[in-house]
């Protein structure tokens, strides 16, 4: 599976590399170091992970669709992917992904909304292509038009 096919990101490996940081390898072949403090310390539901010994017990969830810890604690791969992009120089892709999530748009629906090809949208989501400022502005314009109609 490749992320640009529109499937949810899947992780192949995880290793703790620092204070609430993990090194991840995604099925797409991309490797990122991700600092999870923002999520861990920003979520009451994950407060047990603030303990470094508990955090160090991270493992991959079934199929690589999440990071899991004992006690039924987990963080979804899509959330980790967005954070990985944002922290590793792809803030444009992260912003684009958040726009899609906010409006519940599939790759095809996002392509139709912006008058672009589905493949190009997939490239943006995967971080393979930079999301041009004009596209991010088009997202805001689409959102504004949609709000005006509602």
Across the structure, where does each feature detected by a protein language model lie?
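Motif-centric detector for short Cys/His coordination patterns
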Residues: 1-150
């Amino acid at each position: 599976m490749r992320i640009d096919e529109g499937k949810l990101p899947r992780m192949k490996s995880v290793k703790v590399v620092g204070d609430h940081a993990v090194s991840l390898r995604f099925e797409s072949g991309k490797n990122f170091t991700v600092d999870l403090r923002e999520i861990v310390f920003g979520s009451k539901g994950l407060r047990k992970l603030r303990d470094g010994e508990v955090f160090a017990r991270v493992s991959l969830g079934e199929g690589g669709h999440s990071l899991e810890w004992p006690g039924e604690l987990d963080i979804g791969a899509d959330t980790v992917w967005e954070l990985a992009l944002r922290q590793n120089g792809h803030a444009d892709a992260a912003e684009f992904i958040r726009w899609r999530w906010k409006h519940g748009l599939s790759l095809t629906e996002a392509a139709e909304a912006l008058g672009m090809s589905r493949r190009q949208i997939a490239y943006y989501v995967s971080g393979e292509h930079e999301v041009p400022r004009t596209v991010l502005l088009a997202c805001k314009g689409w959102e504004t038009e949609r709000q005006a109609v509602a």
